[in-house]
């Protein structure tokens, strides 16, 4: 029996099925009309969600995209690593734009804090790795998660016990400063400055701190719908991605339950977001890659065109994204891991005007043909893509709002994607604005 059948609201999880940057922010914003609240459950301010509303561009890094909808309550769950400095910088940007933020934002008391020493370690490690760097954003996300797993992290609730916070901070800094100075060859982080700055955030945070898990339960019990907004993408998941070229958190749908404190049985529908092609930022294997700005051997002109037409630059880092054909074999892996109910395909219009379009449906790996992305980055790096080729279309799909209005060649391509991955495409995004969307099946009504 569904959650809605027993009087509870429906919960939709929106996750990326690629290497991030799939266009989740717009889709979350589009669906927020049907949700009482929007929840971030993992990651930190290392991923930007870009929204274009009424022609105005807004980039959100930490606060859920639902903040752009008046009256929607936004939640930051216990699975998020929180930089108070980044949070208030983002709040100020939004409030300057005329949005009411602090009265609509709830922050889990159990969220882990990102503090200056996490940032220092992140940057020092990448500098030490040199050419072998992973490509982190340098914002302290990974080191903060390390502290959480090591059970030494300072959490939001610790800010409200200054004496205990000071004692634990000193212990942490003794450890991290030793690592910074003796191993990484970097400068130590000042204890007193870190303490003073952190405690200064406490009174500003206090009105927003809540038992998020209990509040989410209450919203559902009253019949309210919730949306869980994933950051990054499945192929960057710390367990299921192309390890070690991954982020430091679980980006899969199952993380919504643990990272927000809700029962997994209350997740009603999983919406997987995928571009009509693939992109990746930073290092790591990418079987269907065509273009990499930093690699002279990867300068295919179709890939260059995808990057330029798709404006493929990181919204947080500004780094050029690597581009390639849609990898349906990798998408199939993501669909299985997440239990995806339906797909939303974004940026279809970027393919307009191509003479032909290729779809990766499998790989040749060590002399064998496989139809799903293998586990482990070494195996993925050895994969040679197996493509199916489709005729392109010259008609514009930009802003199209109905399936039947799409060019026949586009419909054929999309139907083949459905066949390969084994689930339906329920939504198609044909432009950055809210209304540039084709709806085939509504996640809250499915």
Swiss-Prot record:
E.C. code: 6.3.4.4
Keywords: Cytoplasm, GTP-binding, Ligase, Magnesium, Metal-binding, Nucleotide-binding, Purine biosynthesis
Binding-site list for GTP: 20-26, 48-50, 321, 347-349, 429-431
UniProt cross-references to NCBIfam families, sorted A to Z: PRK01117.1, purA
Family named by the database record: Belongs to the adenylosuccinate synthetase family.
HAMAP family the record matches: Adenylosucc_synth
Name of the protein: Adenylosuccinate synthetase 1
Organism: Cupriavidus pinatubonensis (strain JMP 134 / LMG 1197) (Cupriavidus necator (strain JMP 134))
Lineage: Bacteria, Pseudomonadati, Pseudomonadota, Betaproteobacteria, Burkholderiales
